[in-house]
C-alpha cells in the first residue's frame, strides 16, 4: 500500500510496525453540535482506510476519539443550563446515528477525553519533570523552544509562529507559541462539572494533550498512522507530536501522518455566520440519502479540496441511480458468498486511497453488466458489483428499495398500455402515457429485453 505521508511530504510504501496489529489513531468529533459535512468527510475517508487495512492485515486497532470537554461544549451547556455530560451525551448519540447512516464502521475503540484525565495528568507531570513544561499561575504551558524539532510536521519555524498563526495569547508565556496543557477552573467550570483535581489545582486539560493521552493509552508510545483533517495539521497535530515525543524521548509518536483536504460550500468556507453551515443531520432530514453523501466524499480524492453544491448532489444521485439500475435483473437479494471484492477496487485503494478511480471501476462494471447477454454472466457481474460497492460503503439497498418501487396496479396498467401502444406502432399514445406517468413522478427505463423498470422520482 502506498500512502502520502504529510510528515515527509511524499508518497511512501506503508510498512507497519507490527504486521499482526496495525494501529491507527484519528481525531474524532468535538461533540457540541451535530456533525457537519466537513467533519463527516474525514470520518468517511478513514473508514475507507480502516476497511482496506482489514483486508491487508490480520488485525487493525482503530482509535477514533471523542472530544467531550472543550470551550464550545461549555458554552452550549451554559446557554442551555445543563452540565457538559447532558450536552455531550446527546451529540455523541447523534454522531453515531449519523455516521451509521453514512455506512461508517465503528472504530475498535472510541475513547472520550473525560475518561482519560488521569493519563493526561501523568503526561503533564512527565513534561514538567523533563523540562518541557512550566507553570504560571496554576496554568501549565508546553515550552515549544524546548523541542528543537517543533514545526517539522507543518513546515513552520518558531519565528513564523509569532506572526499570523492560530495561537492562544496567554499572559505568562515564555513564547507566543507555547500552548496550554492544563488550565485552572472557573466558577462556570465548577457549576457545569467540567473540571478535575490536579497537582496544580482544580482545572481542565488543554485540547492538544487529550489526543496524546488517548493515543498513548490505547496504542502505546508509537503507532502506525495518525489521521485527521488538513485544518488540524497546525496547531493541533504539531502540538500533539511535540508533547508526545517530549514525554517519551525515544519515541516518534506516529510513523505516518495523513490529512484529508478542506471542504467548502458553494466555493465559500463553511460558516454559521455565512448561513452555509451544513450538518449531516440537516442533509438527511432534507431527503438526501446517506449513500449520496458518502458517494460525494468518495468521488473526490481525499487530499484534494471538495466543494459541496447542488450540482454535486444531483450528479451523485444520478450516478447512484445508474448503478442501482443495473441491479434490476432479479427481484431477490443475491447471496454474495461466492464472489470477492474486485482486485481492481483494492488496487485503487492501495494507491493512496484513490477512491475516485475505484468509483470509476464501479461504473465500468455497470457497463459490463448492461452489455452482458448471458443471464448467468450478468448475475455474476452484478454480484461482484454489489460486493465491491459494499466494500466502499455503498449499494446496500435492493434496486426496489432505492427506487421506492411498489405494486401500484394503476401504474402497472398504464405501463402495460404503453407497451401495447409501442407494439402497435402508436408512439404518440406511448409518449403520452410516459408523460402522464412522469407527471405523477414515475420515471420509466426501458430495457433491451422489452421489460420496463419504473420508480418514483
Curated annotation (Swiss-Prot):
**Molecular function (GO) terms listed?**
ATP binding; cysteine-tRNA ligase activity; zinc ion binding
Q: Where, subcellularly, is it found?
A: Cytoplasm
Q: Where is this motif: 'KMSKS' region?
A: 269-273
Cofactor(s) it depends on: Zn(2+)
Positions of Zn(2+) binding: 27, 211, 236, 240
Homology family: Belongs to the class-I aminoacyl-tRNA synthetase family.
Q: What is the protein name for this chain? A: Cysteine--tRNA ligase
From what organism does this protein derive? Ehrlichia ruminantium (strain Gardel)
State the encoding gene.
Answer: cysS
Amino acid at each position: 500500500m502506498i500512502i502520502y505521508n504529510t510528515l515527509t511530504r511524499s508518497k511512501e510504501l506503508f510498512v507497519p510496525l507490527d504486521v499482526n496489529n496495525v494501529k491507527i489513531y484519528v481525531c474524532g468529533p468535538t461533540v457540541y453540535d451535530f456533525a457537519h459535512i466537513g467533519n463527516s468527510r474525514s470520518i468517511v475517508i478513514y473508514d475507507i482506510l480502516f476497511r482496506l487495512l482489514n483486508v491487508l492485515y490480520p488485525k487493525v486497532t482503530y482509535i477514533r476519539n471523542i472530544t467531550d470537554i472543550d470551550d464550545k461544549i461549555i458554552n452550549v451547556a451554559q446557554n442551555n443550563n445543563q452540565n457538559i455530560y447532558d450536552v455531550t451525551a446527546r451529540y455523541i448519540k447523534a454522531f453515531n446515528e449519523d455516521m451509521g447512516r453514512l455506512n461508517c464502521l465503528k472504530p475498535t475503540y472510541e475513547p472520550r477525553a473525560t475518561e482519560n484525565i488521569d493519563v493526561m495528568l501523568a503526561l503533564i507531570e512527565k513534561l514538567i519533570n523533563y523540562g518541557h513544561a512550566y507553570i504560571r499561575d496554576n496554568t501549565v504551558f508546553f515550552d515549544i523552544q524546548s523541542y528543537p524539532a517543533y514545526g517539522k510536521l507543518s513546515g513552520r519555524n518558531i519565528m513564523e509562529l509569532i506572526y499570523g498563526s492560530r495561537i492562544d495569547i496567554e499572559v505568562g508565556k515564555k513564547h507566543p507559541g507555547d500552548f496550554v496543557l492544563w488550565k485552572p477552573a472557573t466558577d462556570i467550570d465548577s457549576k457545569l462539572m467540567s473540571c478535575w483535581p490536579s497537582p496544580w489545582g482544580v482545572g481542565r486539560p488543554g485540547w492538544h494533550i487529550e489526543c496524546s493521552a488517548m493515543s498513548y493509552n490505547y496504542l502505546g508510545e508509537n503507532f502506525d498512522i495518525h489521521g485527521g483533517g488538513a485544518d488540524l495539521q497546525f496547531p493541533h497535530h504539531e502540538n500533539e507530536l511535540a508533547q508526545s515525543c517530549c514525554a517519551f524521548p525515544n519515541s516518534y509518536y506516529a510513523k505516518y501522518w495523513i490529512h484529508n483536504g478542506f471542504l467548502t460550500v458553494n466555493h465559500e468556507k463553511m460558516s454559521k455566520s455565512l448561513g452555509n453551515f451544513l450538518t449531516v443531520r440537516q442533509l438527511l432530514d432534507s431527503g438526501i440519502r446517506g449513500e449520496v453523501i458518502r458517494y460525494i466524499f468518495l468521488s473526490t480524492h481525499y487530499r484534494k479540496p471538495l466543494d459541496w453544491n447542488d450540482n454535486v448532489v444531483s450528479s451523485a444521485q444520478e450516478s447512484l441511480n445508474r448503478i442501482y439500475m443495473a441491479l434490476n435483473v432479479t427481484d431477490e437479494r443475491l447471496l454474495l458468498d461466492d464472489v470477492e471484492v474486485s482486485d481492481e477496487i483494492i488496487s485503487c485503494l492501495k494507491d493512496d486511497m484513490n477512491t475516485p478511480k475505484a468509483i470509476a471501476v464501479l461504473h465500468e462494471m455497470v457497463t459490463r453488466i448492461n452489455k452482458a447477454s448471458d443471464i448467468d454472466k450478468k448475475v455474476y457481474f452484478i454480484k461482484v458489483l454489489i460486493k465491491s460497492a459494499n466494500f466502499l460503503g455503498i449499494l446496500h439497498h435492493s434496486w426496489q428499495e432505492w427506487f421506492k418501487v411498489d405494486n401500484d396496479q394503476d401504474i402497472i396498467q398504464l405501463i402495460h398500455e404503453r407497451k401495447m401502444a409501442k407494439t402497435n406502432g402508436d408512439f404518440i399514445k406511448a409518449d403520452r402515457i410516459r408523460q402522464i406517468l412522469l407527471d405523477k413522478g414515475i420515471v420509466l427505463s426501458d430495457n433491451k429485453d422489452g421489460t420496463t423498470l419504473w420508480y418514483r422520482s
